[in-house]
Amino acid sequence: MFDFASYHRAATLADAINLLADNPQAKLLAGGTDVLIQLHHHNDRYRHIVDIHNLAELRGITLAEDGSLRIGSATTFTQLIEDPITQRHLPALCAAATSIAGPQIRNVATYGGNICNGATSADSATPTLIYDAKLEIHSPRGVRFVPINGFHTGPGKVSLEHDEILVAFHFPPQPKEHAGSAHFKYAMRDAMDISTIGCAAHCRLDNGNFSELRLAFGVAAPTPIRCQHAEQTAQNAPLNLQTLEAISESVLQDVAPRSSWRASKEFRLHLIQTMTKKVISEAVAAAGGKLQ
């Protein structure tokens, strides 16, 4: 049995917010794939629980008439993978979700939980960055919307107050023509492993040039990051291997990996350059282009 000091199952989103406000020590339980591990190890910071996994307000994937998308924060990774809307409009997010753990974990682990735990290795963070998502956050003070870029503030830290709940992700309309995206993850095992390096790219093409590139990396810095120098190098550059090489050099100005038992800093830098070329090449191919 888990050593709960208090356990509350919220009936509504408003109920959950009030429960958090009334108990500053409380932690949210959605999928439970992270929280239950902490409970198993008797982490005292997780003895007060507010259960939100059944809240309808946190579920669902919807497509608006203007092409924008809303994904509830308690949407599971299996639901992300299987939904035709995400398959069509956010393929890199689906690819990232497929790379997470195994089917049993994906059936319960939530998109919002993966982002809010603040890990730089969170596989869903890089596609969320390249698709320019905004986060809908509720609290006793009302509702605020914040960009995903900057939401991660440090290792294991996000811009979320104790009494705030991430309710949904909002994605702007994605371009339909001459645009493509891709995700790639390197890990020591092919499945059931944490990323050594993860990345995602989104590009738009115009008459043989990059009109836009968005490139994001995880485990390449203390937080998931967008690679501004690499993106600027691609701006209006010709669609050729020389440009790809220049991007893979400039990305080194954006990253700051460290050595760990998983990989040395030097190996991670090598991976970053190699994966930059791979993920951009795949995004270009998805956009109908070809690097000459």
Swiss-Prot record:
Signal as UniProt keyword: no
Catalysed transformations (reactions): xanthine + NAD(+) + H2O = urate + NADH + H(+); hypoxanthine + NAD(+) + H2O = xanthine + NADH + H(+)
Keywords per UniProt: FAD, Flavoprotein, NAD, Oxidoreductase, Purine metabolism, Purine salvage
SMART domains according to UniProt: CO_deh_flav_C
Domain of life (superkingdom): Bacteria
Binding-site residues for FAD, renumbered to this chain: 27-34, 109-113, 165, 184
InterPro entries: CO_DH_flav_C (IPR005107), CO_DH_flav_C_dom_sf (IPR036683), Diverse_Substr_Oxidored (IPR051312), FAD-bd_PCMH (IPR016166), FAD-bd_PCMH-like_sf (IPR036318), FAD-bd_PCMH_sub1 (IPR016167), FAD-bd_PCMH_sub2 (IPR016169), Mopterin_DH_FAD-bd (IPR002346)
Database matches in NCBIfam families: PRK09971.1, XdhB_XDHase
Protein known as: Putative xanthine dehydrogenase FAD-binding subunit XdhB
Organism name: Escherichia coli (strain K12)
Origin organism lineage: Bacteria, Pseudomonadati, Pseudomonadota, Gammaproteobacteria, Enterobacterales
Encoding gene per record: xdhB
